[in-house]
């Protein structure tokens, strides 16, 4: 299954790139593929957010790259256009600093999002969209903006999930401990353990990043996401899509292939015994022999006498007698069962003819078993 895990992680990475590019449908398709290959918690968390909030992605106004070929250092904004000295200068305003300080001072998730404890899904989405755009590190360069952005994502992730929200309401203020232990990552099923990054959550809501075309750095526990350019070759993705059908068929056929291989190996490893209790012309076991102890008849091929002598012959004859006694014992049990059934039927139906027939059964195997038993006892 580890091979499937690697393929699933590749699918998750492709899904993340699709989210950065604003292609939610492609992201959802590759996350579903990852789910089939291996149950990664990160894939499940991303897929749940897309299914729950996918319809809102890209609907809120925020910065986008201009479609033309002009100056790409100036974002085409429809909201929050007054941002101090602008992104190109990496400056920030006093309002941005005050906002970051205000978020980082909040003691619980409800304060972070600025909602009441009975806030519904729409209230949470509205609050998250507003704050995520305002504090995204590609837009807000004030000191502490990254931590504030993580805090906002963590708050929405917990409060938007009914189970997490219920747990959070019961345990009280654990937000600070979560941030210290997991550096801002969050999980929908296992406490504060991370499975989805704030950037992934943002991309699910807004269908892509800011005009810088970069992924801001979030170092968090098991994974670190560095600043990197998003111009990627799509050849591998197309190859993944084309190869999906063949790989799925291979996975489905794997159990059958394994069974066939095991069957072939077992046949190769198990050799035929050098004797038979009955003559078998197909294997050449037609030469009649008799065991020294019980006088059991068995059949061998023409090379047997040359290959089995002394101790080897004694072992073979012991196996012959054990097989013979086992067969006689089983056949005797069948004879007794048949006789008992006939006697019972004769009694129920008052059938004298059937009773006489039951009494007349020869019981040859049982007689042979008695003979063998007397020999064993030295009689």
Curated annotation (Swiss-Prot):
Cellular location of this protein? Endoplasmic reticulum membrane; Nucleus membrane
List residues in topological domain: Lumenal.
266-379
Mostly located where? endoplasmic reticulum
Which terms under GO biological process does the entry name? cellular response to misfolded protein; chaperone cofactor-dependent protein refolding; protein-containing complex assembly
What GO molecular function annotation could you give as one example from this UniProt entry?
A: Hsp70 protein binding
The UniProt entry, under Gene3D superfamilies, shows:
DnaJ domain
One Pfam family here: DnaJ
Q: How does it sit in the membrane?
A: Single-pass membrane protein
Record topology, Cytoplasmic segments: 1-244
Domain J spans what residues? 108-172
The cellular component terms of Gene Ontology attached to this UniProt record, alphabetical and capped at eight, are: endoplasmic reticulum; endoplasmic reticulum membrane; nuclear membrane
User: Could you tell me the superkingdom of the organism this chain comes from?
Assistant: Eukaryota
The annotated region (Disordered) lies at 55-94, 221-241
> Which of UniProt's keywords are assigned here?
Chaperone, Endoplasmic reticulum, Membrane, Nucleus, Transmembrane, Transmembrane helix
Matches recorded under CDD domains: DnaJ (cd06257)
Q: Where are the transmembrane segments?
A: 245-265
Q: What does this protein do?
A: Acts as a co-chaperone with HSPA8/Hsc70; required to promote protein folding and trafficking, prevent aggregation of client proteins, and promote unfolded proteins to endoplasmic reticulum-associated degradation (ERAD) pathway. Acts by determining HSPA8/Hsc70's ATPase and polypeptide-binding activities. Can also act independently of HSPA8/Hsc70: together with DNAJB12, acts as a chaperone that promotes maturation of potassium channels KCND2 and KCNH2 by stabilizing nascent channel subunits and assembling them into tetramers.
Assigned protein family? Belongs to the DnaJ family. DNAJB12/DNAJB14 subfamily.
Q: How does it assemble?
A: Interacts (via J domain) with HSPA8/Hsc70. Forms a multiprotein complex, at least composed of DNAJB12, DNAJB14, HSPA8/Hsc70 and SGTA; interaction with DNAJB14 and HSPA8/Hsc70 is direct.
Q: What is this protein's name? A: DnaJ homolog subfamily B member 14
Q: Which organism is it from?
A: Bos taurus
